[in-house]
Regions:
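Short, surface-exposed glycine/acidic/tryptophan-bearing loops
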Residues: 129-149, 206
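Alpha-helical scaffolds flanking conserved acidic
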Residues: 112-119, 136, 183-188
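Alpha-helix N-capping/helix-start residues
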Residues: 112-113, 143, 279
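Extracytoplasmic and endomembrane cell-envelope/extracellular-matrix remodeling and assembly machinery
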Residues: 53-101, 108-109, 148, 152-179, ...
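Auxiliary, metal-adjacent structural segments of Zn-dependent hydrolase domains
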Residues: 103, 107, 112-115, 126
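Extreme N-terminal leader/anchor segments
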Residues: 1-72
Length: 339
């Protein structure tokens, strides 16, 4: 439990036994939040003498001479953050699958390779991550932002493809930097949106990230946006010192993929049969393909690059597809059947 504006003020840590239900966690957190709120409200009246042990402890967490106004605001700014150690370690291990590719893409785009640590904040490098506002994939693109750089429809959703999404993220970050002129604001814009960041910059100045962090009160500039760049710096620090924080951890190895660009449309089942793999294997390594393809109402589109681990096929993809014959290919996509 901590103050949402002054992150140095950590009121306490609550240990939850393994298996504690969500409802019980919420009950215990709410109970402690209410108790802390009462203490802060009491201190905000100016009380500084005859303090209880809890009042003295809470007051000692704030700088000497803290104002009643600050304490009054703090009573309404108590935030709970669940521990992330296990999730971060899992994401760190997963990052090895795509890290080299991301860094190479970012170099080509003139984006600092350190920004490859950003998915630790966004998704813990989980390609199946979905947010409550509809953001998707390791880079957590929303549909509206993603469509600027990727294909997103009922056939393909490239947000869920780590390669396409990483390339798109590099382009978005490079564009944000071209407008803001500095990386703290370009990275903040990745979360908050460029228009909101530009409003803050007009109010406080182009290079006033610290002022914006402390004092900007835009309507949608909440905790996540305000602290997004700081969270990135923290994630980068842990990423760069992973052996210290996670002794014995190992990065996942990048998969050695065989790839093939389709010259025509094809049903997922026909492609799986031709390659000698299951549709489940095909789906696991081609995450942009939507459910309409696996259900058979749409073909895998012409021009799509298909990936499979080299170990999953016993010949080159070109050879396997050439030997499958012409009957499996189609010149057109299946028509929509919406009602």
């Amino acid at each position: 439990l901590h103050d949402s504006r002054n992150l140095a003020v950590v009121y306490e840590r609550i240990q939850m036994p393994a298996g504690t239900s969500r409802r019980e966690r919420q009950r215990r957190v709410g109970q402690r939040r209410d108790a802390l709120k009462a203490v802060l409200s009491s201190l905000a009246t100016g009380k500084r003498e005859n303090l209880s042990s809890e009042e003295a402890r809470v007051l000692s967490l704030w700088p000497e001479g803290v104002s009643n106004e600050t304490l009054r605001a703090a009573a309404g700014s108590i935030r709970y953050q669940q521990g992330l150690r296990d999730r971060f370690r899992e994401g760190l291990e997963r990052s090895g699958r795509w890290r080299t590719y991301i860094e190479n893409e970012f170099r080509a785009l003139g984006v600092p390779v350190e920004l490859a640590a950003l998915p630790h904040v966004e998704s813990s490098y989980n390609p199946e991550a979905r947010s409550h506002v509809g953001a998707s994939g390791i880079w957590q693109f929303t549909r509206s932002t993603g469509r600027r750089f990727m294909r997103i429809d009922h056939v393909l959703d490239e947000r869920n493809d780590p390669w396409a999404a990483s390339r798109a993220a590099g382009k978005l970050l490079a564009y944000n930097y071209s407008i803001t002129g500095n990386w703290p604001m370009a990275i903040t814009a990745y979360n908050h949106g460029l228009s909101g960041v530009r409003r803050a910059m007009r109010q406080f100045g182009d290079d006033a990230y610290g002022e914006i962090l402390r004092n900007y009160n835009g309507r949608t500039f909440g905790f996540a946006s305000r602290n997004f760049y700081v969270a990135f710096l923290a994630a980068l620090h842990v990423d760069q010192n992973a052996a210290t924080y996670f002794p014995g951890f190992t990065l996942d190895e990048p998969v050695d993929y065989a790839t093939f660009e389709l010259d025509a449309y094809i049903a997922a089942e026909d492609l799986s049969d031709a390659l000698g793999v299951s549709t489940q294997q095909l789906a696991a390594h081609n995450m942009a393909l939507q459910s309409t393809i696996w259900q058979g109402s749409k073909h895998i589109p012409k021009g799509q690059v298909v990936r499979l681990p080299s170990t999953a096929v016993n010949a080159s993809l070109d050879t396997l597809l050439a030997s499958a014959g012409d009957g499996i290919w189609a010149d057109e996509q299946l028509p929509d059947m919406f009602h």
